[in-house]
Amino acid sequence: MTAEKIAELTGHGNPIFTLELSQKPDILFTGGNDKGLVEWNLHDYSFIKVMFPVRASIYAIHGPVGYPILLTGLRSGEVLVFDFIQQKIIKSLQHHLKPIFDIKSVSKKNELLIASEDGTVSVWSLASLEMVHSIKLSADTVRCIAISPDEKQVAFGCRDNSIKIYDLHDYTLLKSIHGHTMSVFTLAYSPDGTYLASGGRDAQIKIWDSAIYQPIKNIPAHLFAINHILFHPTKPYFATASMDKGIKIWGADDFKLYKIISREKGHPGHVLSINKLAWNGDQLLSVSDDKSVLVWDIKFD
C-alpha cells in the first residue's frame, strides 16, 4: 500500500476541526476556528468561496443525503441550516447552549441527531426542522454519533468514557458499554454492521461485537488521542487520525496495520493534531490544527 500527497489546500487562518464532502462531486466543505465555512473544488484543488460567516467556531458539518441543505454545528450550541437552492441560511436550530460536537441523520426516519457538550442528543425532523425529542445521555459531553448500517441502532460516545447504544426505533437505551479509560471521541460501525470500532483520548481502538456489544479486540493504535475512525466506503480498510500527527490505515477484517502516514515515516504530513478524515474514492482527505487540508492518493495492493 502506498500513500502520496497530491494536494494541499491552504487558506484557513486557524485550526480546522471538521470537513464534509458535498453530495455534488468534487466539492468539499471545511470549518474550524475561522469566521466562516469554506467551500473547495477537489477537481483542481482550488478555493471556491467562504459560504457564509459564523459567529463561533465550527465543530461539526453534515449534509443529509437527499436534502439540499448543509448543517453546521457551532461552539455556541447553535446549528445553522444552509439551503443550497436558496443559497442562504434558512434557519438556526436553537436548543443547545453548549458546543455541538456531532451531527448525523437517520435516512429511514428522516431525522437528525445532534450531540452536544450539555450531555444530551436532540432529535429533529428533517422535513420540518423542528425538534421532536431529546435524549439525556450523560452529565457530561456527548462527543460522537455512529448509526448502524441497517439504521436499527445508534451508538453515542461520551466524555465519561462510556459508549451508549440506543434503539433507533424508539430511542430507548439498549446497553451502556465501558472499556475506554478516557473520553470517547470517535465511533464507526463496520460497513457490514458486524462490529463497532471506538477510539478516544486513551489512544486505543476497541472493537465491539455489534450483536451483543462485547469486546472483540483492543488495538494500542496511536501515541495520543484518536480523533477519528473512518471506514473506506468499498474496500476492507479503515483509517484513523490522531493528535500524534499521524494517519494509520488498518485492515477491517484482520485489524493489521497496513500504512502509517506521518512525517516520521517520511511523508509530507501534518505538523499538528489531525482532527478529521474523509474518503473521496481512494483519496483520503485530512484536516488539522496546522490549518491545512491534505489530499492523499492511496494505492491499495
Explain the meaning of each model-derived region:
Residues 9-16, 52-58, 94-100, 136-142, ...:
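WD40/WD-repeat beta-propeller blade N-cap
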Residues 23-24, 65-66, 107-108, 149-150, ...:
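Residue-level detector of Asp-centered blade-edge/turn motifs that repeat once per structural unit
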Residues 31-34, 73-76, 115-118, 156-160, ...:
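Conserved strand-to-loop turn within each blade of WD40 beta-propeller repeats
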Residues 37-40, 79-82, 121-124, 163-166, ...:
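WD40-repeat beta-propellers
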Residues 42-44, 84-87, 126-129, 168-171, ...:
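Short loop/turn segments that connect beta-strands within beta-propeller blades
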Residues 273-301:
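Blade-level signature of beta-propeller repeat domains, shared across WD40, Kelch, NHL, RCC1
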